[in-house]
Amino acid sequence: MAKIYYNDDADLSIIQNRSVAIIGYGSQGHAHALNLRDSGVDVRIGLNEGSKSRAKAEAEGLQVMSIAEAAKEADVIMILTPDQVQAQVYEESIKDNLEEGDAIFFAHGFNIRFGYIEAPQGVDVAMVAPKGPGHTVRREFEAGRGVPDLVAVEVDASGNALQLALSYAKGIGGTRAGVIETTFTEETESDLFGEQAVLCGGMSHLVQYGFEVLTEAGYQPEIAYFEVLHELKLIVDLMVEGGIAKQRWSISDTAEYGDYVSGPRVIDPSVKERMQDVLKDIQEGVFADRFMKDQASGAKEFKELRAKEEKHPIETTGRKLRSLFAWEQTDADYTEGTAAR
């Protein structure tokens, strides 16, 4: 059984007696910074010169400086820049500003697990990873609740790294919901697998194929969109509330029977075998190497794949429908998925 920590297991004064630098001010960065500030923690933001996020951070009353300055001032540095730039940011602006007794934190273990970042001796390396997007982390904190976090320690140079990480998690509201102890390896590999095989890659392509099957059979695109994409949220919400069992209990007998007899025809044992291949590529560093090499060469493959997927007919249909119905988001930037970029 996983070890789970709550409010009574964490001492907020530990992080309150440290100086924290949040490197990056995107989806997670703004939530961490604001929650820590509201928890009485000394926080500053480290950003690249000319960053578009500077004005947003300053508007919240946060102290903003260069990444190097923030790393030099602070003794806890949370790196929340995108995975593909973390190693460069670390080498250019953070590494030489670390001192014995400092700690570097991450919200995802990618760069530590695959060896792109190696901390000097005497520096704690830990992870505090909220299991939710930044706007949810902030909203739940303001409501007096929290989002579950993962916590891990890779290097415990001080002998107090876990307590420091738990204190940080308490500062952003994680211990209100529960903080699960893990390792950098477990978090990184399982997170990448979940994204690629189920949550993002698996789900996206399942939805696209479902849309194609219906429209190619002559059904209206708008009807197909509702049946294979829009209603997906209703099903996922039920799963989150009570597992697959509650989802099956909540739907009609017709739908439940169809789940049992037709689901295995689509997702058969061969899919599981291919999922195991995906996991193997992650574990052996094949995916990480491919991703980082592509990013280093200008992200050519990444951009080509993104452009191709954006042209799928379900996107055109979805944009049209979302603009017509009052129950949808009015913030077009958020609706189209660019708010955190």
From Swiss-Prot:
<dbReference type="InterPro" id="IPR013023">
    <property type="entry name" value="KARI"/>
</dbReference>
<comment type="similarity">
    <text>Belongs to the ketol-acid reductoisomerase family.</text>
</comment>
<keyword id="KW-0479">Metal-binding</keyword>
<feature type="domain" description="KARI N-terminal Rossmann">
    <location>
        <begin position="2"/>
        <end position="182"/>
    </location>
</feature>
<dbReference type="InterPro" id="IPR036291">
    <property type="entry name" value="NAD(P)-bd_dom_sf"/>
</dbReference>
<feature type="domain" description="KARI C-terminal knotted">
    <location>
        <begin position="183"/>
        <end position="328"/>
    </location>
</feature>
<protein>
    <recommendedName>
        <fullName>Ketol-acid reductoisomerase (NADP(+))</fullName>
        <ecNumber>1.1.1.86</ecNumber>
    </recommendedName>
</protein>
<keyword id="KW-0028">Amino-acid biosynthesis</keyword>
<dbReference type="InterPro" id="IPR008927">
    <property type="entry name" value="6-PGluconate_DH-like_C_sf"/>
</dbReference>
<feature type="binding site">
    <location>
        <begin position="25"/>
        <end position="28"/>
    </location>
    <ligand>
        <name>NADP(+)</name>
    </ligand>
</feature>
<feature type="binding site">
    <location>
        <position position="231"/>
    </location>
    <ligand>
        <name>Mg(2+) 2</name>
    </ligand>
</feature>
<keyword id="KW-0100">Branched-chain amino acid biosynthesis</keyword>
<dbReference type="GO" id="GO:0009099">
    <property type="term" value="P:L-valine biosynthetic process"/>
</dbReference>
<dbReference type="GO" id="GO:0000287">
    <property type="term" value="F:magnesium ion binding"/>
</dbReference>
<dbReference type="GO" id="GO:0004455">
    <property type="term" value="F:ketol-acid reductoisomerase activity"/>
</dbReference>
<feature type="binding site">
    <location>
        <position position="51"/>
    </location>
    <ligand>
        <name>NADP(+)</name>
    </ligand>
</feature>
<feature type="binding site">
    <location>
        <position position="134"/>
    </location>
    <ligand>
        <name>NADP(+)</name>
    </ligand>
</feature>
<dbReference type="InterPro" id="IPR014359">
    <property type="entry name" value="KARI_prok"/>
</dbReference>
<comment type="function">
    <text>Involved in the biosynthesis of branched-chain amino acids (BCAA). Catalyzes an alkyl-migration followed by a ketol-acid reduction of (S)-2-acetolactate (S2AL) to yield (R)-2,3-dihydroxy-isovalerate. In the isomerase reaction, S2AL is rearranged via a Mg-dependent methyl migration to produce 3-hydroxy-3-methyl-2-ketobutyrate (HMKB). In the reductase reaction, this 2-ketoacid undergoes a metal-dependent reduction by NADPH to yield (R)-2,3-dihydroxy-isovalerate.</text>
</comment>
<dbReference type="GO" id="GO:0050661">
    <property type="term" value="F:NADP binding"/>
</dbReference>
<feature type="binding site">
    <location>
        <position position="252"/>
    </location>
    <ligand>
        <name>substrate</name>
    </ligand>
</feature>
<feature type="binding site">
    <location>
        <position position="227"/>
    </location>
    <ligand>
        <name>Mg(2+) 2</name>
    </ligand>
</feature>
<keyword id="KW-0560">Oxidoreductase</keyword>
<dbReference type="GO" id="GO:0009097">
    <property type="term" value="P:isoleucine biosynthetic process"/>
</dbReference>
<dbReference type="InterPro" id="IPR000506">
    <property type="entry name" value="KARI_C"/>
</dbReference>
<dbReference type="Pfam" id="PF01450">
    <property type="entry name" value="KARI_C"/>
</dbReference>
<feature type="binding site">
    <location>
        <position position="53"/>
    </location>
    <ligand>
        <name>NADP(+)</name>
    </ligand>
</feature>
<dbReference type="GO" id="GO:0005829">
    <property type="term" value="C:cytosol"/>
</dbReference>
<feature type="binding site">
    <location>
        <begin position="83"/>
        <end position="86"/>
    </location>
    <ligand>
        <name>NADP(+)</name>
    </ligand>
</feature>
<comment type="pathway">
    <text>Amino-acid biosynthesis; L-isoleucine biosynthesis; L-isoleucine from 2-oxobutanoate: step 2/4.</text>
</comment>
<keyword id="KW-0521">NADP</keyword>
<feature type="binding site">
    <location>
        <position position="195"/>
    </location>
    <ligand>
        <name>Mg(2+) 1</name>
    </ligand>
</feature>
<feature type="binding site">
    <location>
        <position position="191"/>
    </location>
    <ligand>
        <name>Mg(2+) 1</name>
    </ligand>
</feature>
<dbReference type="Pfam" id="PF07991">
    <property type="entry name" value="KARI_N"/>
</dbReference>
<keyword id="KW-0460">Magnesium</keyword>
<feature type="binding site">
    <location>
        <position position="191"/>
    </location>
    <ligand>
        <name>Mg(2+) 2</name>
    </ligand>
</feature>
<comment type="pathway">
    <text>Amino-acid biosynthesis; L-valine biosynthesis; L-valine from pyruvate: step 2/4.</text>
</comment>
<feature type="active site">
    <location>
        <position position="108"/>
    </location>
</feature>
<dbReference type="InterPro" id="IPR013116">
    <property type="entry name" value="KARI_N"/>
</dbReference>
